[in-house]
Amino acid sequence: MASKEINFSDSARNKLYEGIKQLSDAVKVTMGPKGRNVLIQKSYGAPTITKDGVSVAKEIELADPIANMGAQLVKEVASKTADAAGDGTTTATVLAYSIYKEGLRNITAGANPIEVKRGMDKASAAIIEELKKSSKKIGGKSDIAQVATISANSDENIGALIAEAMEKVGKDGVITVEEAKGINDELSVVEGMQFDRGYLSAYFVTNTDKMTAQLENAYVLLTDKKISNMKEILPLLEATMQSGKPLLIIAEDIEGEALTTLVVNKLRGVLNVSAVKAPGFGDRRKAMLQDIAILTGGQVISEELGKTLEAATLADLGSAARIVIDKDNTTIVDGKGKTKDVKDRIAQIKTEIENTTSDYDREKLQERLAKLSGGVAVIKVGAASEVEMKEKKDRVDDALSATKAAVDEGIVIGGGSALIRASQKVKLKLEGDEAIGYDIIKRAIKAPLAQIATNAGYDAGVVVNEVEKNSKDGFGFNATTGEYVDMFKEGIIDPLKVTRVALQNAVSVSSLLLTTEATINEIKEDKPAPAMPDMGGMGGMGGMM
């Protein structure tokens, strides 16, 4: 077992401080509308240029093991804030550093760390309550565009694209970000439900120019069975043929005789049919088949439910106004299911999202929710170079997450002013070292505004003092113009969720670090260089001299 080094009290906390300071110094330069970029060397490929706080934090590993422990814990603040709110990582990092710095000064002077932590927790909880009271519900498309624009580093084009995407697919819709082939940004919206399964045979294609199979006013057969015997589906095929409507078969698989017969009858013009595999795997496949059944007003033919293909009738089939299938995807537009059934299914999925503890399951449930409730929007980001593309894509991802957070919980004034305004309204009566914890938070809360002002080239002390002097709710500092304005009117806003989560995470980690009394780390042992191999046996070369 490797030897361990142990550090205690002030020695441990001071070394942790060094790591937290280094990480904060690297991250804070990106803050605000006039924040700078950070250039990051990669182990392979070109360096990355980014203004994304969490991307900077993730790259930091320090040589000193104790300083590195401090940096890694604050890195966790940034990551958790990004996971929960999608933005606010730089704010969380700056707050964590400021809280730890203020707290360390007081604890070194003799304050009790546990009492200080208790006061800090009470102060942050009270400030968050004031933030909630001052928040406003997000309005229409223009509010959404403003939130997205600010988070995308004042890029109005990105803000407009995100606002348009949200308008088209709704707040529960899925918006994905991809790289465009050219230099222009684009938005495309997939209407209806789309899943990633294409036709089982190219012979099902009806539009050879686009290589798609298009079915108008079609029936949909859904089963979790593998179909290989034609006799199983013959009664249904005859019934659909007599109805004169096209048919889409969605099954676990269709193979052998069954697939061959479908293709032959399609080519002869006897049947207008297409077939695809069911989306997903295992239990998720069953759930998605049920989603499609509800959307189209059909039934899933499953032996688990006591239903067989031979006994199925037209009444068991779903239907849709239009179905488009290419080699990779199937899109069902205007399913004929009952609106109430679809709404009930959406409510059920939302409940499952709230109850799940798995990020992967939550992501898959949200995809299902989007497919049922409004479709999928794809923002394609264009740029002149790969480096610019990565940086821009990061900004779009941030802006998208911030916008969703704003829709969830509402908005507060931006630019770091909301924290100061909420702090001014909190009047806690605490005693002893708890009061010190309260004062630490009240002082540290000014750090985001101070950093935004510094990055924009203004005197941080003057700016913070000016904002504190004016008690109007919307009053704040516009770092882009250097003016003091009504932030709501100017559209300088932040999602409440981003500000709230940043403060909660910063206080949580900083207060734990302040109550740390000892650190334990491995001592790196310098391994001696390997010995040179024995050169015996080369003596015969002496004659070459």
Swiss-Prot record:
Cellular component GO terms held in the UniProt record: cytoplasm
Database matches in Pfam families: Cpn60_TCP1
Subunit organization: Forms a cylinder of 14 subunits composed of two heptameric rings stacked back-to-back. Interacts with the co-chaperonin GroES.
Gene Ontology BP, a term: protein refolding
Binding sites annotated in the UniProt record for ATP: 30-33, 51, 87-91, 415, 494
Subcellular location: Cytoplasm
Protein name, entry field: Chaperonin GroEL
EC main group: isomerase
GO MF, any single term: isomerase activity
Family: Belongs to the chaperonin (HSP60) family.
Family matches, as SUPFAM superfamilies: GroEL apical domain-like (SSF52029), GroEL equatorial domain-like (SSF48592), GroEL-intermediate domain like (SSF54849)
Annotated PANTHER family: 60 KDA HEAT SHOCK PROTEIN, MITOCHONDRIAL (PTHR45633)
Catalytic activity: ATP + H2O + a folded polypeptide = ADP + phosphate + an unfolded polypeptide
